[in-house]
Amino acid sequence: MNVPDQSIPVVVVGSIALDSIATPRGKREEVLGGSASYACAAASFFTSPGMVGIVGDDFPKGCKSLFDRLGINQAGLQVVEGKTFRWSGEYEENMDNRRTIRTDLNVFANFTPDLPEVYRGAPYILLGNINPDLQIHVLNQITRPKFVVADTMDLWIEVAPDALASMISRVDMLMLNESEARHYTGHHNL
């Protein structure tokens, strides 16, 4: 997609994946997944979001065409040689709880979210669930955002608590599910 000569209103940084999902209602293989994919799709109903992520050269053209049809600015989408990030999981009946069966980071393992210049003045930033050091790397590239939202998960709470605390101190809103909130705070009565 061509980059307009203006700032992007919303920048979303996160994963772009091919997911294989099992639910009590059925299974799907290699469907579009990832925090950046879904957040950009949702934001596209209101604005033209800027996507920051990485995919391999095996990323389906149909998925990229979907991003085009939704008006998602892809100046921050890196397409590199290798395989796209893949995740496989199973959801319980209530769809609140999931179990990861397999994670293949592939090209996502070497992802460094370097923002195009047109994204750096964005007033609204969503930092998807990625390593908090990478979230901080993004924050260091943005000039005076109005509002920053970050997502995290149990993995980062355990393996990167100092970086996570540093990142949290720089955002306006943190998204956690109930089990992550318990894990992070150490409180079981929320």
At which residue positions do the language-model features occur?
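Structural detector of well-ordered beta-strand residues that form the stable sheet scaffold
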Residues: 11, 126, 148-149, 175
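Active-site metal-binding loops of divalent metal-dependent hydrolases
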Residues: 14-16
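Short beta->alpha connector loops
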Residues: 56-57, 129-134, 153-157
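Conserved N-terminal subdomain of the carbohydrate kinase-like
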Residues: 4-9, 18-30, 45-127, 140-145
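Conserved phosphate/ATP/ADP-binding segment of small-molecule kinases
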Residues: 143-147, 154-190
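Histidine-anchored nucleotide/phosphate-binding helix
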Residues: 34-44, 139
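A short acidic, amphipathic alpha-helical/loop segment
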Residues: 63, 134-141, 162-166
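Active-site glycine-rich loop that binds ribose-phosphate moieties when present
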Residues: 105-114, 133, 155-163
